[in-house]
């Protein structure tokens, strides 16, 4: 029998990572496209309706992402159990995930329902405030469905089955457009709800996607041995919930801190004028789109690293981490090159104002530089989640974003302490600095974990399963 060389192993691992991450990427694109469709279709009603979607999303997203972050403890846990021939324990994790939803949904729902307290103090027009509040209240009915969808998606992702979520999200996107048309503009005898109609349509889509994901999970042949639905309602298990919260809470806080960083940046730039905010938003939108590539790769890395560790193969987990890092940097090289070459054309997609295009193009140069650090920190972060080392991600993220990034950005952007105030350029320089430091620290953390003896590492992971 011919022995497989290291190079052949790397090729196999690279293929596995790409095949696993592509459906995740397409699902992310479809999910983000729903928000884009909502904005465009609401904008055809009025500027106030479009603005309501934007303001509502700025409140909705951090809260929902927190709930989603808690459930992201499931993929590394499930992939580890799957790899270690402990599939009989997977159903228990999924059922306890439902308890995580039940515990988190009450405070999240209350915050969304009473968001009028914040909105009414933002100083916006009364008409806009009322549309935003009604939009969020409509979205609220879809919150349980969305979190249940994430719970069962995490099960499938942990089993390295990423295609179902891709197909279901694409179906959701296709349904979102006609449902928006009916509820926004008032068709088929339904009243015209404007932006609120987007909330109604999204709620319906979330419930449909949730039902489809649960139906797939229940009928999939490769999951019948798990018996997830035999006793779907089980009592909360304090030990399991503690382990899942211990893994998920740092992820949830880290996600929210990142969302909050960019939201606060936009607010701090607002006094500098429309052009500054617009150019920053162009660079941020471009960055968010490109970010889906390393993020998908990072999620695939979590799954395969967790599975390899479950198979008691730390060497394979290490190899997967470095192969993923190579793919991430290779992808960043391509996207950074395209960003630099096409920076004026990219800015021109968003606006026609030459001054805004020029400023946005200069920010996109910094954005191109930032992509390398971003790729490293996202992929290495994915590997660390596979090692179930989520606290390190939280501490490093908080330090780099809030102790380094925000103060440096504010000083360079808004003050003359170091140089003449640089406007949005100052914040983008800070992003490059903070992400580079984060990438170095996260990589060092991964290196330290991988230096542990196999026995020491596997014993620790067994305690966390």
Curated annotation (Swiss-Prot):
GO terms for cellular component: plasma membrane. Its main location: membrane. The chain crosses the membrane at residues 50-72, 92-114, 127-149, 164-186, 193-215, 248-270, 283-305, 320-342, 393-412, 422-444. It is a multi-pass membrane protein. InterPro entries: MATE_fam, MATE_MdtK, MdtK-like. GO terms for molecular function: antiporter activity; xenobiotic transmembrane transporter activity. Keywords: Antiport, Cell inner membrane, Cell membrane, Ion transport, Membrane, Transmembrane, Transmembrane helix, Transport. It holds the Pfam family MatE. It is found in: Cell inner membrane. GO terms for biological process: monoatomic ion transport. Belongs to the multi antimicrobial extrusion (MATE) (TC 2.A.66.1) family. NCBIfam families: matE. Multidrug efflux pump. This is Probable multidrug resistance protein NorM. It comes from Mannheimia succiniciproducens (strain KCTC 0769BP / MBEL55E). The gene is norM.
